[in-house]
Each structure stands twice: as C-alpha cells, then as structure tokens.
Regions:
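A gly/ser-rich beta-alpha-beta helix-loop segment of oxidoreductase catalytic cores
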Residues: 1-34
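Phosphate/pyrophosphate- and phosphate-bearing ligand-binding catalytic cores of soluble enzymes
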Residues: 43-200, 216-228
Length: 228
C-alpha cells in the first residue's frame, strides 16, 4: 500500500473508488469491508468478490451507490521478505536512484512526487484526478497513431491504456483558465477552483474537455469523480 501514500480521503472511501496510484490498486490487498445500510441501519460485510472492483470503480459507485456507509476495511499485508515492491511506474525509480527500495522509501518517493505535481486542496480547490485513463482497442490505437505517433500507451489485459493527461495536454488545456475555473498548470488531469467557481462551471469545463478529446481522438473520457 506504500504506492497509495498521500491519496486524499478517508479509509472508508478507498473501497468505493478502488483507489490506485503508481501501478497499485486497493483490490490487490483488500479482504473485506464492513458497511451500514443508510436506510435500515443494518451492518453488512462485503468481500473482495462482493465489491466488484474495477478500474477506479466498485459496486458502491453502481448497484449500491449512496446506500452504505463504510465503517471499517480489512487489508491483507505481507511480511518482510515476501513483499512485492512496485517501482516501475512514474518517477519512483528515478527518485530512488541506486538505493535498494523498501516500503518506506517507496512511500517517501510517492509522497515527494505527489507533493511536487498535485495542488494542495486546502489552498486550491480540486478533487485530484478528474478523469480515468481511457482503455481502447487495437484498431482505434492504430488510427490515432497515424496522426499522433507520439501518443503513449500501455498494454493491459488485451487492450491499451492511454494517459488521459496526455490527451488533455495535447489539446493545450494544461494551464487553461476561464474565470475562476481551470486546468492545473502542472497536472492536466486536475480541474481547479481558483476561488468562487460553482460546481456547474467545473462540470461545464469537464464536458468541454470531454467533447474536444472525443472530437480529436474518438476517445470518451470518463470522469473518475462522483458528481452529486
């Protein structure tokens, strides 16, 4: 779980989102969670299978949305010597240098990376990454490569994951600002409220970005956030 260091929010929110960062997802260490039904106040245990985890998704964002309050989470951790480290993502290896990695050093590297790239929500209003990284098929990737040969992609379970930030930045939205709403200057996945922007304005900006990405790449960006 060291790769998940500094993700904002409470532990109870982790299963809802199946939080993930730097090559690791919660579902890899998840055992079960306890939750209380908002209407009946009855408690229920949700197993790994029950949660129906997917990429930044779970049963709590679909069939059971707004029905439960998660009160505790049980994780399965590994002992020293059996722990599988994940460092081949982002700038983790670059920060670690030639040192032998361990969970603590990886967590420290992740925290340093996040602090350097992500705005503090206490200072600038934001919800972190606004969009999921889209997953596309081989045929669409081939079409995109004809026009955008520099597009980065990763092979995942028979399909290809594209960094949403790259798509947004390619269309010059990084640092874009309209009134008090905008796209962060250092991280194109983050939409920000500079002071007095409304939720509607943020939503309109996200829809504008989605439309432009689809127009140029035929890729539908899906919001990672839950809009109330």
């Amino acid at each position: 779980i060291e790769n998940l260091a500094l993700i904002p929010g409470s532990v109870g929110a982790a299963p809802i989102q199946n939080i993930g960062a730097y090559g690791v997802e919660l579902k890899e260490v998840f055992v079960e969670c306890s939750a209380i039904n908002i209407k009946t106040l009855n408690s229920k245990i949700f197993s790994l299978k029950d949660c129906k985890f997917n990429y930044r998704d779970s049963i709590f964002k679909n069939q059971e949305i707004n029905k439960y309050i998660i009160t505790s989470v049980k994780l399965k951790l590994t002992k020293k010597g059996y722990h599988k480290l994940s460092t081949n993502y982002g700038d983790i290896n670059k920060l670690l240098g030639k040192s032998i990695p361990n969970p603590k050093s990886i967590a420290e590297a992740v925290i340093k990376i996040r602090k350097s790239k992500l705005p503090d929500p206490k200072k600038i209003g934001n919800v972190g990454s606004f969009f999921k990284n889209p997953i596309i098929n081989k045929n669409l990737l081939k079409k995109i490569l004809i026009k955008y040969s520099d597009i980065p992609y990763y092979f995942v379970d028979g399909a290809y994951k594209i960094p949403a930030a790259w798509l947004i930045e390619k269309l010059n939205f990084k640092g874009y600002r309209k009134g008090n709403t905008g796209v962060h200057k250092d991280q194109a996945l983050i939409l920000v409220n500079y002071g007095n922007s409304s939720g509607i304005e943020i939503l309109k900006l996200s829809e504008h970005i989605q439309n432009e990405v689809y127009k140029n790449f035929s890729i539908k960006l899906i919001p990672e956030v839950v809009v109330w």
